[in-house]
Amino acid sequence: MNCPHYQTQTCISCRWLETPYADQLTQKQTHLQQQISILDQSRLEWIPPFQSAQSGFRNKAKMVVNGTVERPILGIINERNQPADLTDCPLYPARFAEIFSVLKDFIGRAGLVPYNIAKQKGELKYILLTESRANQTLMLRFVLRSETKLPLMRRELAGLSTKIPDLAVVTANIQPQHAAILEGQKEIFLTEQQVLEERFNGIPLFIRPQGFFQTNPAVAEGLYGTAQNWVKNLPVQRLWDLFCGVGGFGLHCAAALQANTPDVALTGIEISPSAIYSAALSAEKCGLKNVSFQSLDAANFALNQDDKPDLVIVNPPRRGIGKPLAEFLNNLRPQFLLYSSCNAVTMGSDLQSLTHYQMRKIRLFDMFPHTAHYEVLTLLTLK
């Protein structure tokens, strides 16, 4: 991938950019192997890594806003502590550059003065732009210091929608603190539509403001599709999807299992109410029965259940599932575990704690090309 920003060192976020892509995959695979090297791999099948496109793969741009209201700069504060314009970043869909040009004009028309950190003055802190690969519609979020400019934004919104016809969801997020915090709790919708629909392997998934959603949709689709293929023929009647987010894993697995056994039951648990709303909407759109999603802490939910599932899916944050939940799963003894991780180091530690389980399949997913980060999926069975 050719990147002028990396060549001039104005942005070095893609730290592996000079490493050939095949070598990137080899290094990541080696790192993954090191994390599980002391575990029993006698029955483990290694599936070849799921590769990513090397450019244009991100569906979301998070832009720090600097400069002036007449000449805003959308991008990052780089390691030289300078604002860098990244509107033509090659990780984004090609059309984002043109959209950002329109947004710069909107910033001026709505009087959205970029927030000045040193002076603690101004209004506009970030612009967040997300695209649905399924239908090319867009979600646009303005992170503001206050609600002062909302009347002007509403006045100019019709003109913005004319220039960007795919604009489906527009919000103002209010983040009043003078701190390096991306977003505040208050989200004000400026459009009637409040969710962006994405579709992976025929399963509709919904993106909401403040909800987590994978930023590499092609690889995310591969991740969910692999999970679906691994479990579709397993003898599963009940499954839990802990840390379920918008329901990607649970819905893919439940849809495949219910195709063979209609009364398969899914329970999804996620601490974010916004994500649970999206997951429930997806289940309804899919026409799936015996599905429930609850807004709870996943570990606490599991520790307080009496019924026993046949399959437990865990997709924890970077810290992993931790010893209490691992020990609970050892004692609960579901026949199958499906573990998805964005941090192979903590996953390796968790798998050491899951002493009653043995890895059967594993696959690396290159969700973040040109960096050291990756996702991994492994299927475990009860010993």
Swiss-Prot record:
Belongs to the class I-like SAM-binding methyltransferase superfamily. RNA M5U methyltransferase family. RlmC subfamily. It catalyses: uridine(747) in 23S rRNA + S-adenosyl-L-methionine = 5-methyluridine(747) in 23S rRNA + S-adenosyl-L-homocysteine + H(+). HAMAP family: 23SrRNA_methyltr_RlmC (MF_01012). [4Fe-4S] cluster binds at C3, C11, C14, C89. GO terms for biological process: rRNA base methylation. Catalyzes the formation of 5-methyl-uridine at position 747 (m5U747) in 23S rRNA. This is 23S rRNA (uracil(747)-C(5))-methyltransferase RlmC. GO terms for molecular function: 4 iron, 4 sulfur cluster binding; iron ion binding; rRNA (uridine-C5-)-methyltransferase activity. The keyword Metal-binding applies. S-adenosyl-L-methionine binds at Q214, F243, E270, N315. Keywords: 4Fe-4S, Iron, Iron-sulfur, Metal-binding, Methyltransferase, rRNA processing, S-adenosyl-L-methionine, Transferase. It is an enzyme of class 2 (transferase). Its EC number is 2.1.1.189. InterPro entries: 23SrRNA_MeTrfase_RlmC, MeTrfase_TrmA_AS, MeTrfase_TrmA_CS, SAM-dependent_MTases_sf, U5_MeTrfase_fam. PANTHER family: RNA M5U METHYLTRANSFERASE (PTHR11061), TRNA (URACIL(54)-C(5))-METHYLTRANSFERASE (PTHR11061:SF30). It comes from Actinobacillus succinogenes (strain ATCC 55618 / DSM 22257 / CCUG 43843 / 130Z). The active site is at C342 (nucleophile). NCBIfam families: meth_trns_rumB (TIGR02085).
